[in-house]
Regions:
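Membrane-interfacial, low-structure loops and terminal tails that flank and connect transmembrane helices
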Residues: 7-30, 107-117, 201-207, 260-281, ...
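N-terminal transmembrane-helix/juxtamembrane module of multi-pass inner/ER membrane proteins
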Residues: 18-98, 139-146, 154-157, 168-169, ...
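Hydrophobic alpha-helical membrane-interfacial segments at the cytosolic entry of transmembrane helices
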Residues: 37-44, 121-130, 287-289, 313-322
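Hydrophobic faces of alpha-helical transmembrane segments in multi-pass integral membrane proteins
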Residues: 42, 125-130, 134, 188, ...
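Membrane-interfacial segments
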Residues: 62, 105-110, 141-146, 150, ...
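Hydrophobic alpha-helical transmembrane segments
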Residues: 85-101, 181-192
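Interfacial segments of alpha-helical transmembrane regions
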Residues: 103-140, 206-213
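Membrane-embedded catalytic cores of phosphoryl/pyrophosphoryl-handling enzymes
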Residues: 161-314, 319, 325-332
């Protein structure tokens, strides 16, 4: 997985596939792609600074006035030997998606499961890149103290964009920003994208997608409130990250994994046998050392900021080497996969620039 990307054989593609890329449904989806992403990004950038002004005041109020039973239920999980909590159903959903994803690549997989393979790959990539990769990397490099540490243990308060007092050697869950519980709940939004863009133009499917999306956002807000009640997170850790996390999910669906293009390819090649097995996992595996390299770079500059361990500045060099080594390999593998999907290497090279 982490070696140089192999050369993939170019398959024969049904000519109707290229014509389908210019069909009206695909053009409509592409037309609203960039504005949708911009709306999410701009809204997220606006909401975070606005919420920042009320971060401490509202978190204190929720902790004092809110239902502590709600806070306990939102935070606990049966995976830590406790009673089931609010985050358990999304975690079980992600685990089931992983199992079905591996099953969909089996030679005995049914056609129905094979048709779901692009969607399962999207869910798996979202879980690895968003709920795990982005969330925990930010926790480790930001190191923000949680409310109960600031109020009861005299840890210094820091804003969401500032380096906090925690370091990764204190534990992988010590950082407050962003909220992993909220990110897990928001991963259920993948189903809305699947139902809305799954190739069915039925109003019922799209109404279901919109309704489910509203429910997921409400559940995520409730999770953020519950985590503030239990003094485990500031509001900016959870509510402030809804739109940025949603933007990452949107980016994965349309820009990076290009699900509409994959669905058109699926119609022309129903078995999907031309694609490398578990290619989404391999892609995530190549992105992991790049993410680690970026973290090393930030850790290095963070050591200069605190001036306690200046020798950690050497991590910048390690990070640069990791990014420099794995970035071209990741890009090469990604391009080769979509050369197969598009069936035209020159076209894919133009589209990925």
């Amino acid at each position: 997985v982490l070696g140089p990307a192999r050369i993939l054989t170019q398959p024969s593609i049904n000519p109707s596939f290229h014509a389908s890329l210019n069909s009206e449904p695909y053009i409509v989806r592409s037309t609203y792609l960039t504005p949708g992403l911009l709306v999410l990004l701009i809204s997220g950038i606006v909401v975070l600074p606005v919420l920042q002004h009320f971060d401490q005041e509202w978190t204190v109020w929720l902790h004092e006035q809110g239902s502590h039973k709600l806070g306990i239920w939102m935070g606990r999980t049966m995976f830590e030997g406790k009673l089931p909590g609010a985050s358990d159903p999304p975690v079980l959903f992600l685990l089931a998606s992983f199992i079905l994803y591996f099953r969909s690549w089996s030679s005995q997989a049914s056609q129905g499961l094979i048709r779901w393979r692009p969607f399962l790959g999207f869910i798996v990539t979202t879980a690895l890149a968003g709920s795990l990769g982005a969330v925990h990397s930010l926790k480790w490099v930001i190191g923000r103290a949680r409310p109960y540490e600031v109020w009861g243990q005299n840890w210094p308060f820091s804003e969401w964009y500032e380096f906090g007092p925690h370091f990764i050697n204190e534990g992988i869950y010590r950082g407050s920003f962003p909220s992993g519980h909220s990110a897990v709940i928001l991963s259920l939004l993948t189903l809305s994208y699947i139902w809305f863009n799954g190739g069915s133009n039925r109003p019922r499917a799209r109404s279901l997608a919109i309704s489910w999306g509203v429910i997921v956002i409400i559940l995520t807000v409730m999770m953020g409130i519950g985590r503030a009640i239990s003094a485990s997170h500031w509001l900016t850790d959870s509510l402030g990250m809804i739109l940025p996390t949603w933007a990452v999910l949107h980016l994965l669906f349309f820009h990076l994994l290009k699900l509409p293009v994959q669905l058109e390819y699926l119609r022309s090649s129903p078995s999907l046998t031309d694609l490398p097995r578990f290619w989404e996992l391999k892609f995530c595996g190549l992105c992991l050392p790049i993410l680690l390299g970026m973290m090393f770079i930030i850790f290095g500059f963070r050591s200069v900021r605190f001036q306690e361990t200046p020798w950690l500045l050497s991590m910048v060099l390690i990070g640069v080497l990791l990014v420099s080594f794995f970035w071209p390999r990741m890009k090469s593998f990604y391009s080769q996969v979509f050369q197969i999907i598009h069936g035209n290497p020159e076209t894919e090279n133009v589209r990925t620039k």
